[in-house]
Amino acid sequence: YLPRVGVPTMFILAIYILTFTVGFPANVFTFVTLLGKARRRVSSSDILLLNLTAADLLLLLFLPFKMVEAAAGMTWPLPVALCPVANFCFYSSIYLSSLFLAALSVERYLGVVFPLQYKNRRRPGRVMAASVVLWLLACSHCSIVFISQYHGGRNQTAANRSTANGSDASACYDDFSRDQLSFVLPLRLELFLVLFLLPFTVTIFCYTNFVRALLARPNIPLEKKQRAVGLAVATMINFGVCFAPYNISHVVGFVKKQSPDWRVYVLLLTSLNAALDPVIFYFSSTAVQRAM
């Protein structure tokens, strides 16, 4: 439970504003740069980076809704219909980011460890098709926000009422009933397993072997090795800081049969991903480096 007014909500609002201020221009800049390069000659990594940037922009475009929610003391002063839409886009972008970060690690791993085989089989069309599958995977899983609020025969947003500044205001996607929790918590555990743990495991394996293979080759320039290490470190920090705490809350909630009180704070960390991803873009794309 969060106080409806006071330091915690203002802290959340400040983090959202900082994330938007830093992340939005950086991601727009990166998207335009990558799109310009892709128009001349598209590569597999460019396609994946464009999708990762698009996922970040999706989060950032709906972040103002979360700002309004925080400014209103964690209540929802906007039309009720916008609540599931805003949360669907917000949560989808989180898992899209983890999936495309994992896809980038696979692309880097195959290109270094199996260069000849991968070069012969690498096709932009295949990467585009895989990207569509990842979008469908994340969005289909996160569509539970449209179902869970009405599970049990009541509209959660309309039903949860709290008092803020002396007037009634609704809470958005919060304070689930027992019936709703019995529906939501197992699905959250699946999100942890399929959309976080699996991509994270793949990413660790790929970048560990990617960096090891590069460092073992004396003919690779030192600058390229440093970029590889920087890319791996930035990605691991992103997973560890932005995604891991929030997804661990899924496991804790499933075990305890209720959402942990600190869940709202670790959800806050996921938004920082949109501000940290440009660091990954810098290490991943020479076009972005030249543009900067």
List each model region and its residues.
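Hydrophobic alpha-helical segments of membrane proteins
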Residues: L61-P64, S140-I147, L197-F205, T235-V252, ...
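Loop architecture of class A 7-transmembrane GPCRs
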Residues: Y1-P3, A70-Y95, F114, N120-S131, ...
